[in-house]
């Protein structure tokens, strides 16, 4: 069973992110980029909030979701039923009996974040070789000319939300440098009537865009567009 990085916040994850994010707007923009592609892989589907919106707009799509969090996947299963194929897998060891036209990550295994004038990959996978392997695994599941979209997120900013006067959700963000490498430290906390009822710390490795794109090229995924830094799109080379 892969390590569940989100176990400590599964009870309050949806309430927090639903107040912070317009999943319908993201789904609308994203399906525009899908074109006529049918077999879609969500890398780090979480509780399925984005896919719920996608299938309302495009019910004919065949969507598969993978995630390392059994607790969030349980909620995805309740929300999406049998319409979406769900697997508790680490993308680093991805083995699915299927090929895809397109894979994407929206704040899943990886996201891009804007750090001043620099675009950085924020990766839940910390080890460099493992990140490389995760790219290789996704490329191996894409058909020729298939695409990988890594979506930009604002996960590197703090947030505080009062739900109903009793419950408060909060994300605090700090940066840490260890042996010359940069990490984002995200602390999610839920308070009820001033008392802490949930806390989850998530660490993400930060990598320069250029370095990430070299790693993607090494597995046959070349950049074709970045949609104003919002949707970074990579395409797998067709076989000669
Ligand atoms: C911030 S949540 C985003 C969930 C969802 N994509 C959304 O937009 O609400 C990050 C998700 O990525 C998953 N994740 C992190 N590392 C992963 C990995 N190596 N393989 C698969 N899923 C991973 C986490 O378990 C978590 O569900």
Which sequence ranges carry the predicted segments?
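Class I SAM-dependent methyltransferase SAM/SAH-binding core
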Residues: 49-93
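A short acidic, Gly/Pro-enriched loop at the edge of an enzyme's catalytic core
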Residues: 95-103
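Mobile active-site "lid"/loop adjacent to the S-adenosyl-L-methionine
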Residues: 111-130
